[in-house]
Each structure stands twice: as structure tokens, then as C-alpha cells.
């Protein structure tokens, strides 16, 4: 886990795996996306900020923690993106996200695909699920791993995709499924590319 400036708790399934829970508990600054604050507060924690339009925040929390709520009624984007924009405006670029998957598959796909937008906005972001971590990437990148660890690569705009340290060769994938279920052969691997792609590392 890399050092972060802040964490976003989205309004999907509350994390249950040890790694995302540890990332959440050790975060120096926590932004909850609207209703994501309900479970966080119920567990005895207090967020630094609650972002959104308040449509999924319990009335009791809305009243008691009104001073923490940063209202953003913009309906053209979602609360996760509003939280990223809020943090970037504060100069917080190294961002972890938890709770972005589960509950609704359409929200899950949307939250995952938006990671590429955050990369373009200048954020260094990782989204932790109960099964692995999504890392949006551009150009050539190297990752730490353990031998045999599963990894998937989803191509967005990358050309010239090549790998070092993975079991199976990669290429300029045209469908997301084509880059799934690869695995590490060493304690690190490198993706060589020009353009954008998304890496998923299974725990």
C-alpha cells in the first residue's frame, strides 16, 4: 500500500477484506460520498468531509453532521468524481478509493471506468475492492507483485502493449476480456505502452 493524501469512501458495499479496511482505517483524511457516510458513522468513525447532494444520507446524519457536508448538486457527474475534484482542489493528489463496487453493477462499471478520467485530471489514484486493486496507468509502468499473483490489463487508448514479468504475452487488446487472468512470474512486472490502460491486481 502506497502512502496517500486522502481516501474516498464511496457508497457501494462497505469493505470487508483486510487490505481495504486497513487502508480506510489508516487514511489521514477521509471523504465520504453521500450515503457512504451512513455505515462509516454507524461504525463509530467521523469523516472529514461528506460530498454529494445528500439524496442518500440519512436524515439524522444530515442534521447532526451538517457542518461536514460539502453540497455539490451537479447531476452531470457522480459523487465519487465530485470527491476527487474536491481533493484535487485542496492539492491532495494521492488518493485511495474504497467502497466503489457492489450494490449496483452499473454504478460499479461507471466508478471503475472513471478512474481513467481521474488519471487525466492529475490524480494518482487506486481503487481497492475486497478482491484486488484497480490502478489506472499511462505509458510504461512497473508494479510490485508476488510470484503467481493474478493480474488483468484493460486497454483504453494504449498502443504497443508489451510485458516483462508476466506469464502470457500481451498486445493491443481491443476487448476488455482479452487482458484478463494473466499472472506474475517474478516479484515485479512491467507494462510497456504508449497510452492509457487499467491494471487490476488480485490480492
Predicted regions and their residues:
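N-terminal beta-strand-loop-alpha-helix module at the start
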Residues: 1-61
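Structural motif
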Residues: 10-12, 101, 202
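Short, well-ordered secondary-structure micro-motifs
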Residues: 43, 61-62, 107-109, 137-140
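Short phosphate-binding loop-to-helix
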Residues: 68-91
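Internal, conserved structured core segments that host functional sites
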Residues: 82-84, 90-108
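Short Gly/Thr/Asp-enriched flexible loops that form oxyanion-binding sites at enzyme active sites
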Residues: 106-116
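Class I SAM-dependent methyltransferase SAM-binding "motif I" and its flanking Rossmann-like core
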Residues: 117-145, 151
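Long, charged alpha-helical interface segments
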Residues: 137-203
Amino acid at each position: 500500500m502506497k502512502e496517500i493524501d486522502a481516501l474516498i469512501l464511496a457508497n457501494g458495499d462497505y469493505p470487508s477484506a483486510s487490505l481495504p479496511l486497513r487502508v480506510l482505517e489508516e487514511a489521514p483524511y477521509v471523504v465520504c460520498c453521500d450515503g457512504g457516510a451512513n455505515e462509516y458513522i454507524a461504525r463509530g468513525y467521523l469523516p472529514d468531509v461528506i460530498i454529494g447532494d445528500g439524496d442518500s444520507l440519512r436524515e439524522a446524519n444530515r442534521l447532526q453532521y451538517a457542518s461536514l457536508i460539502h453540497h455539490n448538486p451537479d447531476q452531470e457527474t457522480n459523487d465519487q468524481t465530485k470527491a476527487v475534484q474536491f481533493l484535487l482542489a485542496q492539492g491532495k493528489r494521492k488518493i485511495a478509493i474504497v467502497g466503489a463496487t457492489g450494490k449496483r453493477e452499473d454504478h460499479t462499471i461507471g466508478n471503475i471506468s472513471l478512474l481513467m478520467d481521474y488519471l487525466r485530471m492529475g490524480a494518482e489514484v487506486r481503487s481497492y475492492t475486497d478482491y484486488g486493486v484497480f490502478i489506472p496507468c499511462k505509458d510504461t509502468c512497473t508494479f510490485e507483485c508476488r510470484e503467481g499473483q493474478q493480474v488483468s490489463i484493460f486497454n483504453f487508448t494504449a498502443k504497443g502493449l508489451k510485458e516483462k514479468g508476466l506469464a502470457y504475452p500481451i498486445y493491443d487488446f481491443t476487448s476488455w476480456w482479452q487482458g484478463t487472468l494473466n499472472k506474475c512470474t517474478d516479484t515485479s512486472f512491467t507494462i510497456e505502452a504508449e497510452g492509457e490502460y487499467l491494471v487490476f491486481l488480485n490480492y
